[in-house]
Amino acid sequence: MTEPDVDVARTFLDVLRTAAQTGDRSALYPLLADDVEWLTPQRDVEGIEAAQQELTWIKPPDTLELEFDEPNLSDLGGGHVVSDVHEVYRVKGTGEFAYARDRRIDLTIRDGKVARYEMRIVG
């Protein structure tokens, strides 16, 4: 395992989780490379400036609370780290289960920053 890459990935995923739960994305941007590629099924964003302007959807749902299981990280070498993430959505106020979703997050780490983020819904 390439420990520095895994450490960067783990820190990034922790910060991303906090951003998704609070809507505060400010701690996310310093972890991204200037030429970051951010790829999701809904849209693609390229470059740090575009990320700062367009990642506004990273926020908590209005009527749901979001929980994350601890990410399972796999170091594929060469700065490539993959994580399977399980999310549980609950109704705000009651805590009643709404739904769950599994995602695969594929990261490329370069010079201690996330150079590429690709998220796919897998379940």
What function would you assign to each model-found segment?
Residues 66-69, 98-104:
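Short, surface-exposed coil-to-beta transition loops
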Residues 25-30, 34-75:
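A solvent-exposed, acidic/Ser-Thr-rich amphipathic alpha-helical stretch
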Residues 80, 100-123:
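Short beta-strand edge/turn micro-motifs at domain boundaries
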Residues 1-34:
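Short, low-complexity N-terminal intrinsically disordered segments enriched in polar/charged residues
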Residues 9, 13-16, 32, 51-55, ...:
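Hydrophobic alpha-helical core bundles mediating ligand binding, dimerization, or RNAP-core interactions
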Residues 61-63, 89-99:
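Short, cysteine-centered beta-strand-loop-beta hairpins and adjacent loop/turn segments enriched
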Residues 39, 84, 117-118:
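Beta-strand residues in well-ordered beta-sheet regions across diverse protein folds
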